[in-house]
Amino acid sequence: MAVIADPETAQGFRLAGLEGYGASSAEEAQSLLETLVERGGYALVAVDEALLPDPERAVERLMRGRDLPVLLPIAGLKEAFQGHDVEGYMRELVRKTIGFDIKL
């Protein structure tokens, strides 16, 4: 599985053991997506929906004649936690996982 998201979110996925690729623009995300699809080796590629404004068109164009990878638009952390304490959530998640509170 590979994930294309903003650089901070991609880093989080890498820390979780997945292949995370950071993109700062829709053009950069599109280029990364094309590279990953052409290279092959992934059953699933998740893409931050903020970086893929027209997922249906991307799937149609990139996946013509291919079964894999499955392209999955996902909400980015910024959108998912809009108005919430992201730092507190991540700190609590780390504390539960490793048993220590880490102040970022």
Curated annotation (Swiss-Prot):
It holds the Pfam family ATP-synt_F. One of its GO terms (biological process) is proton motive force-driven plasma membrane ATP synthesis. The keyword Hydrolase does not apply. Signal peptide: none annotated. Transmembrane segments: none annotated. Keywords: ATP synthesis, Hydrogen ion transport, Ion transport, Transport. GO terms for molecular function: ATP binding; proton-transporting ATP synthase activity, rotational mechanism; proton-transporting ATPase activity, rotational mechanism. Gene3D superfamilies: 6.10.140.810, ATPase, V1 complex, subunit F. SUPFAM superfamilies: AtpF-like. The keyword Metal-binding does not apply. Produces ATP from ADP in the presence of a proton gradient across the membrane. Belongs to the V-ATPase F subunit family. This is V-type ATP synthase subunit F. The gene is atpF.
